[in-house]
Structures are given as C-alpha cells and as structure tokens.
C-alpha cells in the first residue's frame, strides 16, 4: 500500500503540479445557497487543465502567507489575489440590485446550469461529474440574495453543507476545516479547528486521487459553543468556514459565509452556560475544601 501510494504521488506530482480544488457553494438548511467566497463567474468547471483557466478562483491557503500582503486570512487566488470576504458578502447583501435586469438574467442562467447538473447521478465516492460546457455562474446570480433571504444556515445539529469542486488529481481530499465565528474572515487568529463529518476522498498525505472535474458534498461541524457573531460586508452574525486539502503544491480550497439556525445557536449558548455553571461549581468545591 505504501509503495502504491508513493507511485501515485510521484505520477500525479509530475503531471499535475498546478491542479486544484475549490469550494464552490454553501447550501443552507434554510434553502439559501450562495457561492464560495473565491468564486469567479466564467471559471470553467469542466476542464482539468490550467491552460483553460479552471484554476482562477481556487484558493491557495498556506499558513506562512495568511494575514500578509500576499494573502488574507482566507488565502489568495490566481485570478483575484488576496481573498476579500467583505467584497463578496457586500454583493450578497446588495438588495438594491436584486431585481436589476442583468441580475435577473444571471439568476435565470444559473438556474438552468443547476438544472442541467442535477440530472447527473453521483459516482462511487459520492462525487458528481461536471457536464461538458459548465462554467461558474453563481456569483452575479447571488446579488442581493442574503439581503432578501438571509445567509445560508447550519442544520440544527450545527453542521453546514458545502460543495467542493475537484479540478484535478491533486485537488482531492481529505480536507481540513477551520471556522471563524467572530471576525468575518478578517483575523487569522479567530479561526478554530472544525470537524468534517462528510469529506472528499483522497490520499491525505498529498491531497491526491484519480478524480477530476467532479463536485463532492462536504459537511462541517461547528465547534462546540461557537456562536456566529461576525460583522462583515453589511451582514451580521456571520461565520466563515475555510477548507483546504494537503496538496504539496497548495494547499488548495476555499471558504464560505453562513450563519446558525436558531436551534443551533440556542444549543451553542446553552453549551456555554453549562460550561460556566460547571466551572463555578468546581470553584465553589475548591473553596469549601480549603
């Protein structure tokens, strides 16, 4: 098995030095779906090669670069530079533009794109192949959606559903996740490790698999006690999830903005209250022992 893995790593590294994987959307339990914070309309989703522009909106998320002039706390992309969560969320919150003719046309085009993709069945491993001719259409279509419908919400158990598009072999999983519940994706130190309950298949040592141009479902669990309280881009109670793989040439991934369902928020608050009560109880017991 180790020998086979070594062969795969060598082969993929030699032929796919620039291959990527990107977070394309977040699907809220409240029925609201928004694109990933790095998504760029027009980026090909049916092409595995860098020459076609398929890597333009993939986030490169390297710890040594985060929070510097080179990359924000959410990384950087080839097509847009440092990732700016505020800029994308401002678009989601632009309620004044939601009924403009070009935005309505973008929504219609995006709906047709989604309908075409919905006819395909998942393959082994849970991934769905991207139809020929597919490109990113979700960004302009999302104009004003959060202003009228709210941000996507977690499920009541605190998990958030995300879609990860694997461009090529070293854009595979498994992924790791971090969630910022306080700074709106601005502060590197605000991110907490989060558990992924549904992951993208792949060799964790290098983010490799044989899949390409496929979409995979991902589910991320909010850290216990975390409550979405960030304010960014005109939105409040914002959480940011940042996902990435272990690709040697990356890591690659992306990020999404969301909030908690009322039930999930209540659970988090109750968890924190229980922790405080337990801490006070321990302190009282220690005083009594003295």
Curated annotation (Swiss-Prot):
InterPro entries found in the cross-reference section: Egh16-like
Pfam families referenced in this protein's UniProt entry, alphabetically: Egh16-like
Species this chain originates from: Pyricularia oryzae (strain 70-15 / ATCC MYA-4617 / FGSC 8958)
Entry's Gene Ontology cellular component terms: cytoplasm
Keyword check for Glycoprotein: yes
Residue segments, region Disordered: 121-140
Name of the molecule in the record: Appressoria-specific virulence factor GAS2
Signal peptide: 1-19
Keywords attached to this entry: Cytoplasm, Glycoprotein, Signal, Virulence
Predominant place of localization: cytoplasm
Disruption phenotype annotation: Does not affect vegetative growth, conidiation, or appressoria formation, but redices in appressorial penetration and lesion development.
Induction (UniProt): Expressed specifically during appressorium formation.
């Amino acid at each position: 098995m180790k020998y086979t893995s070594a062969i795969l790593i060598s082969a993929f590294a030699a032929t796919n030095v620039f291959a990527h994987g990107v977070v394309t959307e977040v699907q809220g339990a409240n029925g609201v779906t928004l694109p990933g914070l790095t998504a760029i309309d027009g980026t090909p989703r049916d092409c595995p090669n860098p020459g076609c522009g398929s890597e333009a909106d993939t986030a490169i998320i390297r710890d040594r670069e985060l929070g510097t002039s080179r990359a924000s706390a959410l990384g950087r992309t080839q097509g847009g530079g440092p990732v700016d969560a505020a800029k994308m969320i401002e678009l989601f919150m632009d309620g004044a533009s939601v009924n403009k003719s070009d935005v309505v046309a973008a929504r219609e085009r995006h709906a047709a794109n989604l309908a075409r993709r919905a006819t395909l069945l998942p393959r082994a491993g849970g991934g769905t192949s991207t139809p020929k001719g597919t490109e990113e259409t979700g960004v302009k279509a999302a104009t004003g959606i959060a202003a009228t419908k709210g941000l996507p919400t977690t499920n009541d158990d605190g998990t958030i559903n995300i879609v990860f598009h694997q461009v090529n072999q070293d854009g595979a999983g498994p992924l790791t996740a971090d969630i910022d519940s306080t700074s709106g994706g601005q502060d590197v130190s605000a991110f907490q490790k989060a558990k992924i309950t549904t992951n993208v298949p792949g060799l964790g040592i290098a983010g490799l698999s044989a899949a390409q141009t496929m979409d995979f479902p991902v589910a991320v669990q909010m850290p216990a006690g975390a409550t979405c309280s960030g304010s960014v881009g005109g939105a409040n109670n914002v959480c940011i999830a940042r996902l990435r793989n272990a690709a040697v040439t990356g890591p690659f991934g992306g990020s999404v903005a969301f909030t908690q369902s009322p039930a999930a928020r209540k659970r988090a608050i109750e968890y924190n209250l229980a922790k405080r009560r337990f801490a006070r109880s321990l302190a009282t017991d220690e005083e009594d022992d003295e």
